[in-house]
Amino acid sequence: MEATNQNLDSVLKKLRKLQNLYEGAKKINSEGEANAAAAAIQRLLTQYNLSMDEIGTDEEKAKDTVFEEKVDGFTYKSIGGEWEFRLLYVLCKWNFCKCFQVGSTYRRLMIFGKKENIETVKWLRGMLAERFVAFSKNRFKEYKKTMEYAMKPISMDKYQRSYLMGCAAGLDAKLKEESDREKAKNAEFRAKVTALVVRNDAAVTEYIE
């Protein structure tokens, strides 16, 4: 992944094209496909950030500053639980943003990061949440046919909360695996990404403080 050979507009076009491919999310039919889609977006967003860092003009870099945005962490009210916060936290973690609870509740969240990164994280969160919730309903139907359910039945929302927390954990593992694999391919790329993450974290931390 050579960022210096990529035009910023070209990278953004690829990112938009991939988002459009997954728009509507119905083409994603399994947890594995959902995680793979998120990993593909992650690769392009990393490429975009490296390109901006290395070949972006002074004007582009001046506009590429840290922002903050409040988001709802309780959009699926019939399910409840902290899974939406956990999902957003994972996406921020691997896409150059930070996510915090506002006060003591997971229902109100704040994202910090550069504009393109925040927009991508929000898009991923919406797409993945919709798919994971749809999967959870199907998995619950299957679970109700098992001996485990017959012996100790649980409500659908309780099952979904557990399942969706598992989806967030699985996504975290997939994105870490993808990041490690990309870094292992090229020592120079690994060094650039590590340095970029450090600088980005410092910029976000400075903004928050």
Where do the language-model regions lie?
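Extended, helix-rich structural scaffolds rather than catalytic motifs
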Residues: 2-13, 50-209
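Non-transmembrane amphipathic alpha-helical segments
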Residues: 11-25, 44
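Inter-helical turn/loop segments and adjacent helix faces that build the functional surface
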Residues: 27-29
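Short, charged, amphipathic alpha-helical segments
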Residues: 31-39
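Contiguous, well-ordered alpha-helical segments that form the cores/surfaces of helical PPI scaffolds
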Residues: 39-43, 89
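Short arginine-rich
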Residues: 43-51
